[in-house]
Amino acid sequence: MKSHQFSTALCQNTTQSNGQPLRFPSPAKLNLFLYINGKLPNGYHELQTLFQFLDFGDWLDISIREQDNQIVLTPEIPNLKTENNLIYRAAKLLQEKANIQLGANIHLDKILPMGGGVGGGSSNAATALVSLNYLWQANLSIDELAKLGLTLGADVPIFVYGQAAFAEGVGEKITYCEPAEKWFVILKPDDSISTAVIFQDPNLPRNTPKKSLEQLLSEPYKNDCEKVVINHYSNVEKALNWLLQYAPARLTGTGACVFAEFDHEAEAQAVFRQKPEAFFGFVAKGLNVSPLHAMLKQLSSTHTHRQSKPEVL
């Protein structure tokens, strides 16, 4: 059975036989807190939010196509044309930017829920950019990759840089940080959230005072979107209320996923075993360094080690 928890699989994933794909992690993220500080004249909202990665997510199996420059993406996603898929668009952007003549076979092993607020699509796009930059030896800097990623989505650069981060403004001001790496039970209620509906709601708080990162990290975390979301979506409210029986719990982003935090894995697993069948969910540890970057560091170390081995006579 394939593992969607990266820590158990990465150590076995740094060798590639000729023509065989490499598996690259595409992790989920949580917004550990989210505060709305104001609304700008252009309609955008000023935010303060804290991103952290999870040791859980999708995999992208990628191999180089030397015979042509085609991007072959599988499987097909219902009601989504391949050319509109963020993974495909990321690959084509990198090809054009770096003038790459090679192609790629990309298989998405999908587990993260669509529309859950855990960054699945943005993470997939970032993993495509970062991994193909490595495989194609495109040699773009991390800043160049992040700029490409920003054209695909506001959250893509966070996944490209691969470090837990505090974001301010409309998301353009980034400070890297190291919040506690706790264990989480994440539930995905059967609701599809409209972010536009949430941000247009007149009851959405829009005047939370700005605070320093140090102060925010020392206070209980909250999400300003939570009350509005549960007013619109009853299944989110049910999932959140269930988690609150056991531990502090919040919405991530605008949902639909909700999460509860624990200090130890055993506590999280014990609660998860009692999960109602109606909710998709998983247990994962928070990570301040993306598993994708951990893998690339491992790959680079392995490559350097092999190059430095003395020749056997």
UniProtKB/Swiss-Prot annotation:
Enzyme class label: transferase
Annotated EC: 2.7.1.148
TM segment ranges: none
UniProt keyword terms in alphabetical order: ATP-binding, Isoprene biosynthesis, Kinase, Nucleotide-binding, Transferase
Gene Ontology MF, one: 4-(cytidine 5'-diphospho)-2-C-methyl-D-erythritol kinase activity
GO BP, one annotated term: terpenoid biosynthetic process
Family matches, as Gene3D superfamilies: 3.30.230.10, GHMP kinase, C-terminal domain
Catalytic reaction equation(s): 4-CDP-2-C-methyl-D-erythritol + ATP = 4-CDP-2-C-methyl-D-erythritol 2-phosphate + ADP + H(+)
Binding, ATP: 113-123
Record flagged with keyword Amino-acid biosynthesis: no
Pathway field: Isoprenoid biosynthesis; isopentenyl diphosphate biosynthesis via DXP pathway; isopentenyl diphosphate from 1-deoxy-D-xylulose 5-phosphate: step 3/6
Pfam families: GHMP_kinases_C, GHMP_kinases_N
Presence of the UniProt keyword Kinase in the record: yes
Domain of life: Bacteria
Active site residues according to the UniProt entry: 29, 155
Function per UniProt: Catalyzes the phosphorylation of the position 2 hydroxy group of 4-diphosphocytidyl-2C-methyl-D-erythritol.
Stated name of the protein: 4-diphosphocytidyl-2-C-methyl-D-erythritol kinase
Species assigned in the record: Haemophilus influenzae (strain 86-028NP)
